[in-house]
């Protein structure tokens, strides 16, 4: 749809979305704003007035990703999972040492363990299992500030794999090809928070044949295997549910973002953090009245997202962010600025229909890109975001609920069945090299918690 005005600035374009039938022509608006100094302010006020019509009641509809209408599929009866009973030093001892592991954005590894333990897909008979799960917590070694230290993780994971391969026959039967592991850190099984170091390390060699469940997703990247299942990061469902605005709350913010633009502690010279995308957002739009952006994280953060049309989701050190989850939950259209990102449950969730993708190099014209999206497309994205199945698929609630992210993980595993017969090895055959990897990763790991 063509806009009725060829506007020279972003504020004018933004207004073109929300001009409903009560507005009699764009000439009136153009004549209203004569003084250039008042132009942005007046147009922003008009924008706030007209945007209230966008929050009208919307109907729900079925959602289809590339795998079809699968968000509401029930995985029970489609797969069986055997959980290895391994020593607590690999999992719950970490939690006893630091319960903050249950509240950070990597907490899915703990919660998935609990979920599978009680799930009807669990089998106690490994001979009938389709999948084998090793509950290793690789993001629960925290700094005083609550950030995970992944540097021990390769040794912890190697130790756990050595344990299951020496106590059960199933790992050696396939070299782990029918096993899955949860690796929710920034760059997953590359086990480093800086991309350059993660690429240098690569995926832990012993996991080459296993299926990885990870938050990191980027095409053509050494830290993502083709058969990995990309999941959303953990965001506390209860906290978000208690902060919901009334449905009639108008969306009076055009574009919203809270977070770092620079990371002087880890990137003192600038330009490396977020590949410069966040810095470009700040430098180009810090004074633009359409953009509500700041490093300050207000107490009303969740409420503010519910008043925004667009929520910016730029990459940080890694391409993924909890803002993706928050945007979907709060009906704020995610603006995804992360080249080649692979999004959570991409075969089930139609991200192209609910979000806006902006290449990192195009950040300086972000205002123009957003303002050329027509009114009908905005409404359609909001209509899809309003679907309860969409929101449920992004959350890890306790107790679990049908269609939630736990069930989407199981659905993803079920869609990989049956296993190809070629994964089963001949006696004495193996594709793994237990001495491969950085020398520091090969040191034994024991009870050094």
From Swiss-Prot:
Pfam name, any one: Exostosin_GT47
EC number: 2.4.-.-
Function: Involved in the synthesis of glucuronoxylan hemicellulose in secondary cell walls.
Class in the EC hierarchy, top level: transferase
Gene that this polypeptide is encoded by: GT47A
The keyword Glycoprotein belongs to this UniProt entry's keyword annotation: yes
Coiled coil: none
Membrane side Cytoplasmic: residue ranges: 1-31
Compartments in which it is found: Golgi apparatus membrane
Glycosylation, residue list: 172, 433
Segments on the Lumenal side according to the record's topology features: 53-449
Protein name: Probable glucuronosyltransferase 47 A
Superkingdom of this protein's organism: Eukaryota
Record organism: Physcomitrium patens (Spreading-leaved earth moss)
Similarity comment: family membership: Belongs to the glycosyltransferase 47 family.
Principal subcellular localisation of the protein: Golgi
Tissue specificity as recorded in UniProt: Mostly expressed in newly formed or expanding tissues.
A GO biological-process term: xylan biosynthetic process
Keyword annotations: Cell wall biogenesis/degradation, Glycoprotein, Glycosyltransferase, Golgi apparatus, Membrane, Signal-anchor, Transferase, Transmembrane, Transmembrane helix
Lipid bilayer topology: Single-pass type II membrane protein
InterPro entries attached to this UniProt entry: Exostosin, Exostosin_GT47
């Amino acid at each position: 749809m063509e806009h009725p005005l060829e506007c020279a600035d972003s504020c004018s374009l933004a207004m073109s979305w929300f001009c409903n039938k009560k507005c009699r022509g764009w000439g009136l608006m153009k004549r209203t704003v004569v003084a250039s100094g008042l132009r942005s302010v007046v147009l922003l006020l008009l924008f706030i007035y007209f945007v209230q019509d966008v929050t009208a009641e919307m109907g729900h509809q079925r959602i289809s990703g590339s795998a079809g209408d699968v968000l509401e599929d029930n995985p029970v009866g489609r797969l069986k999972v055997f959980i290895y009973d391994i020593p607590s030093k690999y999992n719950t001892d970490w939690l006893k040492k630091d319960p903050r592991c249950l509240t950070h954005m990597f907490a899915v590894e703990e919660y998935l363990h609990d979920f599978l333990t009680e799930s009807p897909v669990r089998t106690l008979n490994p001979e009938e299992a389709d999948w084998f799960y090793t509950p290793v917590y690789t993001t629960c070694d925290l700094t005083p500030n609550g950030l995970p230290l992944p540097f021990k993780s390769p040794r912890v994971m190697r130790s756990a794999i050595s344990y299951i391969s020496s106590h059960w026959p199933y790992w050696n039967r396939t070299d782990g090809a029918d096993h899955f592991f949860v690796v929710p850190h920034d760059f997953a099984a590359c086990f480093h928070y800086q991309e350059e170091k993660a690429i240098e390390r690569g995926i832990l060699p012993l996991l080459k044949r296993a299926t990885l469940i990870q938050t990191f997703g980027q095409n053509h990247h050494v830290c993502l295997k083709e058969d990995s299942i990309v999941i959303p990061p953990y965001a506390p469902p209860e906290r978000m549910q208690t902060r919901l605005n009334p449905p009639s709350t108008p969306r009076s913010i055009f574009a919203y973002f809270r977070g770092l633009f620079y990371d002087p502690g880890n990137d003192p010279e600038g330009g490396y953090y977020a590949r410069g995308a966040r810095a470009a957002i700040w430098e180009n739009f810090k004074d633009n009245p359409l953009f509500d952006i700041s490093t300050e994280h207000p107490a009303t953060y969740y409420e503010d997202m519910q008043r925004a049309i667009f929520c910016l989701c730029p990459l940080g050190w890694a391409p993924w962010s909890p803002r993706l989850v928050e945007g979907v939950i709060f009906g704020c259209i995610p603006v995804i600025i992360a080249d080649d990102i692979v999004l959570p449950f991409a075969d089930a969730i139609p991200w192209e229909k609910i979000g806006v993708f902006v290449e990192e190099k195009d950040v300086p014209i972000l205002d123009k890109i957003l303002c050329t999206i027509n009114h009908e497309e905005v409404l359609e994205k909001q209509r899809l975001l309003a679907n309860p199945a969409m929101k449920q698929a992004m959350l890890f609630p306790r107790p679990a609920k049908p269609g939630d992210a736990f069930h989407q993980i199981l659905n993803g595993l079920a869609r990989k069945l049956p296993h190809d017969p070629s994964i089963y090895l001949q006696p004495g055959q193996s594709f793994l090299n237990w001495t491969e990897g950085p020398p520091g990763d090969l040191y034994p790991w024991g009870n050094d918690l």
